Amino acid sequence: MIKNVAYFPLQCALNSGPVMSAVLDCLQSRGIQTQENSMTSDAAVIWSVLWHGRMSANRQVYEHYRAQGKPVIIIEIGALYRGNTWKISVNNITSHGYYGHLDNLDWDRPKKLNISLATQLVSKPNVIIAVQHDRSLQVAGVNMSDWVKNTISTLRNNTDRPITIRPHPRCRLMLNNLPSGVSIESPKKLANTYDSYDMHFDCHAVVNYNSGPGIQAAIAGSRPIVHSTSLAHPVGVGFADIEQPYITNRDLWLTQISHTEYTLNELEQGLWLNRIHPAL
């Protein structure tokens, strides 16, 4: 088990204060020292793997610690209950990260988080392509504009449904001369939120590389078409099955995925640390 953890207060989102404090207080309560701006600790905790804005410098921290084989604890805004739950993982926030979410499950956890599965009875005909920020570790090596173009082509080989492109709200796409039947929908910020945007899952399917919309689509009952590194991949469908009924059993998956995110009170209590400690 690690003895100390580095943290970097100036490299966090402006709304991170209570969440980061809860994590640091929990570590200290377990006898783990927290060291500000240290590059020599046993591990590091960083806010997000989006190398952009205030968090740009986290990339240097991440690469420095990983190059030494040291774990990096990542805090990320949650996909289950955005603004109320927070994702905690080790080394990545895709399926390549460690969450400790596959075993020793609390089967009542989805209910505790007020999360339940929906089944679509009627949906709009369109397919949404939910694009990610190109500066995120999640899509390292992936050109998002090229990915969108290739996704459109693959969709057209499997369906004639209208396609709606949803860009990441803080990342511009270079998309010109879109084919007919393809439109762009600009995200709209929700009032009285820090950084939440409108997103509706009353569509036929959602194509997403490996971020929150894939998870949210699966919960909402909209077919998620995702990369193998997505946490939604176990309940995803392939492009070739886009016109088939979405009847995948999602019960186990929902319980498992609900063990990847925590409320502020749970961060203080240390449920997350109990889960990830084998990776530290």
State where each predicted segment sits.
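A donor-sugar binding/catalytic signature common to diverse glycosyltransferases
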Residues: N192-F239
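N-terminal pre-catalytic "stem/leader" segment of glycosyltransferase-like enzymes
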Residues: M1-S48, S136, L280
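Short, well-ordered secondary-structure micro-motifs within conserved domains or adaptor modules
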Residues: E36-R66, V206-Y209
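Well-ordered, non-membrane alpha-helical segments in soluble/globular domains
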Residues: S16-L24, R54-Q60, N143-T154
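Short acidic low-complexity segments
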Residues: Q33-D42, K188-M199
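Leloir-type glycosyltransferase catalytic cores
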Residues: T85-K124, P234-L280
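Short loop/turn segments at strand-loop or loop-helix junctions that form parts
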Residues: F8-L10, W47-V49, I75-A79, K124-S136, ...
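Catalytic donor nucleotide-activated moiety binding site of glycosyltransferases and closely related
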Residues: F8-C12, K149-N192
